[in-house]
Regions:
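Nucleic acid-binding interface residues in structured DNA/RNA-binding domains
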Residues: 2-102
């Protein structure tokens, strides 16, 4: 069954992303839990992949559950580094240091 993605849901996700402080990151799952949709981390990712259609949001601050950055978002790493976010390796943020504590 397909999930219906309404404009309200899109803006709810984007509003949650807007709350992530500079220099910190959240996971897709954290954002899903924050909006009361615990099992919808993939839906969050889908919405964020189209976020530029809705305005300027700090989507670069959202990573997967292990801290990995998005493979199709080449400027994500540079933006995070510019905010002082440390990486454990080439593609993974150090979540112990930079995970947003909600």
């Amino acid at each position: 069954m397909r999930k219906i993605v309404t404009e309200d849901l899109i803006y709810e996700i984007l509003s949650a992303v807007e709350e992530i402080p500079e220099g910190e990151v959240a996971t897709y799952g954290q954002i899903a839990r924050l909006i009361g949709r615990d099992k919808n981390a993939r839906l969050v990712g889908k919405v964020l992949s189209r976020a530029e259609d809705y305005g300027d949001y700090p989507c670069h601050r959202v990573v997967n559950h292990s801290g990995r950055i998005a493979p199709n978002f080449p400027e994500q790493k540079d933006r995070l580094l510019a905010e002082g976010v440390a990486f454990k390796n080439d593609t993974c943020v150090d979540l112990e240091k930079h995970r947003w504590e909600i």
